[in-house]
């Protein structure tokens, strides 16, 4: 999330989603960033934008659906000048939202892919130029392959499924096993 010690990081994530832990606590605290927590009953884009303005949020992450609601508001009426880095997680983002958010804020949204069982696998890493429609590059801790339905690696530019090589062991943060259920783990 490109956090820093003098920043205020805000991730919107339900606690049932792994993103709640690895997206708003572990890395942010390790980097000595303030972690902003805001509890709300129902998501309202205007309320969140107001909170981001009031508390001078510097880095922000939310599912793309929330950005779709943000662009329905007049984002320019909020002072988001403190906002320096925005990320998305959870689903693909359509170009219209990416472009409208960029036009309103001057910020390019950084995409990534991960699961509760893996943490962040592929991302627009710090220092990379965000490119709409691209999840970025594999995280250095993972040995990533794109494979077809038969498990064969596909060529660059081909569609495939993201798979992780774990023959040498699972990276830190990756799901290890089902608790006391070796049969389920073997599946």
Where are these regions (language model features)?
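Hydrophobic alpha-helical segments, especially N-terminal targeting/anchoring helices
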Residues: 147-148
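Gly/Ser/Thr-rich beta-alpha loop segments that engage phosphate groups in nucleotides
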Residues: 18, 92, 116-118, 135-138, ...
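Conserved ATP/PPi-binding loop(s) of AMP-dependent carboxylate-activating enzymes
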Residues: 138-141, 152-187
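Conserved AMP-binding/adenylation subdomain of ANL enzymes
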Residues: 1-58, 73
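Short, solvent-exposed loop/turn segments at the edges of secondary structure
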Residues: 23, 28-30, 81, 139-141, ...
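Beta->alpha turn/N-cap motifs
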Residues: 63-64, 168
